Amino acid sequence: MSTKKQNIQAELVDPDAGVWEVEATIDNGDFGTRSIRFETGLLARQADGAVTAYLDEDTMLLSTTAASRQPREGIDFFPLTVDVEERMYSVGRIPGSFFRREGRPGTDAILAARLIDRPLRPTFVRGLRNEVQVIVTVLSMDPKDRYDVLAINGASASTQLSGLPVSGPVGGVRMALVVDSDHPEGQWVAFPTREQEEKAIFELVVAGRVTEPVKPARGRGRGRGKGAGSSEPNVAVMMVEAGATDNVVERIAEGAPAPTEEVVAQGIEAAKPFIATLCEAQNALAKAVDAETREFELFPPYGEDVFASVQAEALDALEDIMAIADKQERDEALAANMQANVDELLPEFPEREAEIRAAHNEVTKAVVRRRILEDGFRIDGRDSTTIRDLGIVVQLIPRAHGSALFERGETQILGVTTLDMLKMEQQIDSLGPETSKRYIHHYNFPPYSTGETGRVGSPKRREIGHGALAERALTPVIPSRDDFPYTIRQVSEALSSNGSTSMGSVCASTLSLYNAGVPLKAPVAGIAMGLVTGKVGKAGKDKYVTLTDILGAEDAFGDMDFKVAGTPDFVTALQLDTKLDGIPSDVLAEALQQARTARLEILQLMEEAIDSPDDMSDLAPHITSINIPQNKIGEVIGPKGKTINQITEETGANITIEDDGTVFISAVGGESAREAEEKINAIANPQQPKVGDRFLGTVVKTTAFGAFVSLLPGRDGLIHISNLGGDRRIERVEDEVSVGDKLEVEIADIDNRGKISLVLVEEN
């Protein structure tokens, strides 16, 4: 394990243009090194801050930060916008849209923007009201890499140069637990390539900042331990986004370590030295260009005089109100108390209503936190480890292929599963190598779920993010294409919300998928955890209280939102956001174990409702697969698709043919699928017709000299006009037979070209 320290300094590479750059090396030991380089002064010179970030040589993006000169009026929040622009030229492709240009951001770009926003937003000084926009443009991307984590660092670096008041740079790193023959216990690898990700069983994206000046060591990440350097930089973890890989179950069966809570905690620790290195590089660049913080007018949410008056007026009433267990009753009482405070104090503080309301929220927050820290009770009367009452109803929607209702307290999620052919996979046109997705998870959060009105329509960024988290939690247990050749669309409807609808979606989805007959590798459940910290007692000792199954108010008033999903044996997905300057390792480990205990309790109740896949619904398509020789694929399809279209029309089945000769046949009725299978086999593996064979055929064409009869798919024979009338002479074929007629015929002759001559079979 290397303990060498990097001497990170910015270099003036073009004195005439004023171009500076700084480079940080990410040392992964046996897995090689990666280079992260920041450059400023060449591109986007009119932006307040602009940085070009490189991962090695071929992955390159431009991050710009710009701020309005005047604060935005009439708002009580910080107007930060983060946008990621994916350019198709970055991978040498022309967009596939009609106009051949990029349109609105895709899912990958939206998720990358959220990854940037979550750790960057808390670094801005409180009370800033100027509009700030961070735009990351992907200019070049190596197919072996991802750009999202590089974008976190680039966005932070450009913000450091913008003159905006921030607390310091943010570093982001992707960690993969790679398991191979040389590392059977796994090694955490920073900025892994896609090839290394294929060998991984778990991945983490960790973002954080250094809370005091340190000289970080160059990390090497050996083993599953801390894996990077011997010195411990004081890094505050601000965000974690993590998930198991889609083949983790098979890898564990082969002997790989399971990604348990302990392993996940080790991965977070292993990321810290790399974060410190990236923060040091950003600081070096900002120091070199002499980036000075400009003066901005700040708008604190309330004045101290207002807060003191609100506290004196409302504290006692809020102690009683925040002990009301029912959310609607509590919200109504809280709103009434706030309005009473406004009416009482507005004459004393004219034109400061917004401050009174903000101070009221702060007093409410203090009451909730004090009750948890000192009394050990939460808003609804639970202790720190109790889960709210659970309710489960399976097969709620009559014509859905699978459905389930999952309730946890006042949070209510409806999960609905739809199955279809593999050709219904979602087609992906993005910068990555993925071209399709078989398991699709959509999450909807209508305004009525919180008793409000609002816009409905296309999904917001939050809905896309929550759907992606639930999808990540379930992907590791979705059966393979070979075991279950279906496209699966899972929809989570948040019908009522009071805390962690995303983890409720994971539970509802497991139940719904089982109800649809999907043979999951293991059931998955999720739980949202919270954290409240403060000083208690006369000595002012720091106290950390981890909360299981947090309410919406506990999320808003607490210090951490920590969502964990998994099977009984390992973690499948994790998401962490914290407002603290770091969480002690033992507190994080305790939170993970507390989450596991809750998850096992929920899984047990889910198992009582449904413990294995149900039979598939009669309304769902039943898919069978057969294999045909590759040289027969063209014959099954026919000229311009004639043969396969004919089979589809005659049987009502949907047919998909893969390049390797695998044929998927889908039909709501089993008889249709069997009939289609017989017709395909008759073409691909036919019995060669011979003289004397009899068939009940269908007339497919009439001519002046006879009628063509279909014997097998793709094999027709001719009844000459002289053989149609028996002993009678007929003038027109159409006088005897028409297209579509069924005729019993016998093969009279097959010439050397394979053409078949038929005769009618006499009735006797």
Swiss-Prot record:
Belongs to the polyribonucleotide nucleotidyltransferase family. One of its GO terms (biological process) is mRNA catabolic process. PROSITE patterns: KH_TYPE_1, S1. One of its GO terms (cellular component) is cytosol. SMART domains: KH, S1. One of its GO terms (molecular function) is magnesium ion binding. Its EC number is 2.7.7.8. Mg(2+) binds at D555, D561. InterPro entries: ExoRNase_PH_dom1, ExoRNase_PH_dom2_sf, GPSI/PNP, KH_dom, KH_dom_type_1, KH_dom_type_1_sf, NA-bd_OB-fold, PNPase. Keywords: Cytoplasm, Magnesium, Metal-binding, Nucleotidyltransferase, RNA-binding, Transferase. Its cofactor is Mg(2+). Gene3D superfamilies: GHMP Kinase, N-terminal domain, K Homology domain, type 1, Nucleic acid-binding proteins. It comes from Corynebacterium jeikeium (strain K411). Residues 621-680 form the KH domain. It is found in: Cytoplasm. Residues 692-761 form the S1 motif domain. This is Polyribonucleotide nucleotidyltransferase. It catalyses: RNA(n+1) + phosphate = RNA(n) + a ribonucleoside 5'-diphosphate.
